[in-house]
Amino acid sequence: MPSALVTGGSSGIGFAIARMRRDEGYEVTLAARTREKVEAAAAELGAHAVTANMGSEEDCVRAVSDHRERYGGLDVLVNSAGLGIAGTVDGLQTKHIDLQLGVNLRGLLLVTREAIPLLRESKGWVFNLASIAGTAPTPGLTVYGATKAAVIALTRSQNLELEAAGVRAVAICPGFVDTAMAEWSGLATDEMITPDDCAEVVRMCLRLSPNARIPLVVIERVGSRDLVG
C-alpha cells in the first residue's frame, strides 16, 4: 500500500491533501506541532499522528523516521507546514524573520533531505506548498514571499538532481486559500481558493506517466487583480 507523509497536516491544505490520499488508499502520517490538533485530525482520517515542529531539526528528522518505522517506505512527501507574518523588511523583528525562514524553508529542506532515500526507492513525489507570493513582488509580505520564491527554486533544482532516480517535485503556488492563515485578508470564503483545489493538483500529478512532470503549478483566484491571489 502506498504511503504519504504530510507536514502541516492537521488543518487547511495539508489536511485536504491527506484526506484525499486516504480516500485513494494511502497510509498517511500527519505531522504538526500541536498534539491535540494533529491527533484529532489523524483520528478523523484513520491516519498516524506525529507531533513535530518544523522549526526543529530533531522534530523534522523524527517525523520521517517515525513514518519509515511504521510503514517501511514513502511514496509521497507533502511539505505543507508554513506560516506568514505580515510586515516590511524594516518593520519585522529578527525573531519573525527567523521563524518564517526556519519553518518555510529550513524545515522543508530538512524533511526533504531525510525523505530522499525513501523516495529514491519508491520513485516518489515531493509536493512543496509554495505560494503565488513567491512568483511576484508582494509588499508587506516580503519575507514570506522570499521564502516561497526559495521553495520554488529548490523544487526546480530537486527535479534535476533527482530525475535519474525517478523522483519528481512540484511547487504548488496558490493565491489566497480558505484557511485560517488567510483570515487577515478580509476576503469572503466564496472568493477564495479551496484547500481541495490544492489537493486536486496533487491527485492530477500522481496520475501522470513516468515521463512527465509539472515543476510549478500556479493557482489564481478567478477575478483577482491583486499580487498575491
Residue ranges and their predicted role:
Residues S131:
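Residue(s) in the substrate-gating loop at a strand-loop-helix junction
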Residues S10-S11:
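Conserved glycine-rich cofactor-binding loop
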